[in-house]
Amino acid sequence: MPMSARSRRSNPRLPPSPSSSSSSDAVRASPHSSPPSRLRPPSANPDVSSNILLFLIGFRLVNALTVRTFFQPDEFFQSLEPAWKIAFGTNQGPWITWEWEHQLRSSLHPLIFAAVYTVADLVARTLGLTPTSRAELLIAGPGITQAVIAAVGDFYTWKLARYIYGDRSHESWATVRIRSNAIEADADQLQLALTVVSLASVALYRSAWGERQTLAREALICGSSVLAVSTVVDRFFYGFWTFPPLRFLYFNVAQSLAAFYGRNDWSYYASQGYPLLLTTALPFTLVGLYRTLKTPPKLEKQKGSILVQLASISLAMPATLSVITHKEVRFIYPLLPALHILSASPLVEFFIPALTTTNREYISRRLTLIFLLWANVAIAIYTTLFHASGVISVLSYIREQHQIHGTANIPSLPKESPASYGGITTGFLMPCHSTPWRSHLVEPTIHAWALSCEPPVGLTAEEKAAYRDEADQFYDNPTQFLQDNMVGGLRHIPRRPSYATPPSSQRQPTQLFPPHEWPDYLVFFAQLEPTLKDALRGSSYGECWRTFNSAWHDDSRRRGDVVVWCLDHAKQQAWQSQKHQRELEDRDRQFDHIIKRFQRDATPSKSWHWSHWTSPFSSQSKSWSWPWERKKRTLFGYELPDLPQWGWFGKRKKKTLLSDFWF
């Protein structure tokens, strides 16, 4: 927080405080100045804000380009799939979910990524990029755009914290945290709004009546303009006038369709939501909430009121959402910036003494800080690169196979009927929305289908109670489902892939709804592998690819590796040869490791230790022995008994030959 003018005049050697936002300048210009707080060292760069923004953009770009995992289906099916439809047309294979068919979503969000797709496709055509490079550009484009939005959200979160705690306080630097997962755009837009709404509340509190009227008028004009633009855009997207927020409330509250996707306990957000959202910051957030609501913050009145507003919203929003039976952590994700601001002050108070002094009293706090940092880094790395990575990698494999066997070498396909061209077929026997769709498949000639999970729209209460979607029917009895819902059942499975079949005998697969055609590639989780081996024994399907997906999963149907079976015997043999070669390499590395252990144990150590000490009254056998054989000690030719193992000297673990075979 800024120091008072009197204290600055009494010490002329203090540097002037750096400039901040216009709202902060207005508050500092008032005669009421905040009390001194812990100050950061003066910055040598006068334009700190621009440097911070550039750093956040760079960090977010690296974050976006290194993400290799799957977070939530909505980051693809509620944004990128509708955007693909806007940019390339319906016949290019986007999966449009039921929410869009019933006008439950606004098209403003997908419109951003539709523009990105259009620009990326134009760049690819202008530069003459290969299909592989074009696909990578189309996949990376939305992530780069979202990274910039997230960076701006982080920047304005920092600006709000700087306004509350002061330009040079530690708290303003403790609020921006790493978020490894993909973020919905409306969450970041709310981060931007947090600053505007909070500063507007301060202006409303301090201003005269005329200025309040001006602020209210501008808020009304801006809100009405956004609502009008959203309504017009939805009119062009859906083809008729509609109001998605009202229909969203009707379907999810009046018809209770949200409960179809799961019911949660009333305390979900308190017992699971906040812990999953905040992880290691949870204790500091709880302290910040308690202090803010229990005792008045030691800040200026206006700044303290902002913290009270943030704390109230952070409690009121989960309480309101708890009324709805279906709950998810991402519903309270927009609260994360506010929660970080509230946790900043307790975090600084706890760790700053341990970092600014060398007192041994704070060793435990230093160790705690190191643990929290490493815990966050470990979580970020695992969730960004490993957990649920197989469902992304498998689509890269499918695209590679399409490059080999499909028609990706065609420079451009007409949007009217891409299905008339050849390609490869893929079926996903997974819970619905387990993988991204056309945003990662890219090529329209990759003909794919997957199990659906449409809710019971328009059914009676009795019909809703007995309703089972397609994915549920499959997992209830996989063998019977394949018999009843696949073309030809289990007795007429193709022997050859479609790309090796003459065009006259090819049949175009039906997307998304049964009956499904038997595809060239079957994709499923390893949990289902024993069932499919039994159901498809004797068929031409065999394993041709496998990759790690997750070490654990809360959904038992999604556990294990992602496995791909295919009809191409050459690919099956190549994969088996590759697996055998990998096993040989692993065995050779293990054997080399054992040999090195033998050589190291057989070579006498040059370092002196107690085991090499020999009493003048004893003699060791000089004959050669195996490295793992226990050495004997004798006295005048008689073997001495082993010394007892005293507990206070510590029990030394003896190495055996068996231990050499383990890493």
Curated annotation (Swiss-Prot):
Pathway: Glycolipid biosynthesis; glycosylphosphatidylinositol-anchor biosynthesis. Residues 19-42 have a biased composition (Low complexity). Residues 1-11 have a biased composition (Basic residues). Residues 1-44, 492-512 are annotated as: Disordered. Its main location: endoplasmic reticulum. It is found in: Endoplasmic reticulum membrane. The keyword Transport does not apply. It is an enzyme of class 2 (transferase). Belongs to the glycosyltransferase 22 family. PIGB subfamily. Mannosyltransferase involved in glycosylphosphatidylinositol-anchor biosynthesis. Transfers the third mannose to Man2-GlcN-acyl-PI during GPI precursor assembly. This is GPI mannosyltransferase 3. The lineage of its organism: Eukaryota, Fungi, Dikarya, Ascomycota, Pezizomycotina. The gene is gpi10.
